[in-house]
């Protein structure tokens, strides 16, 4: 919880309240269950909100080769560098080379949401991951699939996060 500045599970340990973050393990286990092997890969994260520090921690544990963040509000993305010196920040709309792209924005929660990015030059053999699991297939995932890429929603992350919380 300290590394992410985020707590989503609390419990009593010898009459002391302890905070824990289960999103890190949830994301990590969810990715390990997918076909994507993260070690040595370049990652692009869209968004800089509450779940992103947990995703960065998990990706660092998986020994990815690089993490780039793109957020509509660049200052918010820049603030993540205080805790994560290894990340790069790019402007919203800029899509650098990546192996895996993660939608960690709220775009897609509503069925009619459309992500305002041009993915036409992305190509195939990439992994599109959306932390959103309802709807099951967001517009972001539909774009990834249409371009011939593997896609995965955040359902396994959610399941593993909950499972970890109950341990």
Residue ranges and their predicted role:
Residues 29, 133-134, 150-167:
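Active-site capping/gating segments
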Residues 21, 31, 40-60, 64, ...:
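Glycine-rich adenosine-cofactor-binding loop
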Residues 13, 36-42, 123-124:
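Short helix-loop-beta connector
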Residues 1-34, 143:
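Phosphate/diphosphate ligand-binding glycine-rich loop within oxidoreductases
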Residues 61-66, 146-150:
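Conserved S-adenosyl-L-methionine
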Residues 62-84:
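NAD(P)-binding Rossmann-fold cofactor-contacting core
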Residues 85-152:
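Rossmann-like adenosine-cofactor binding region
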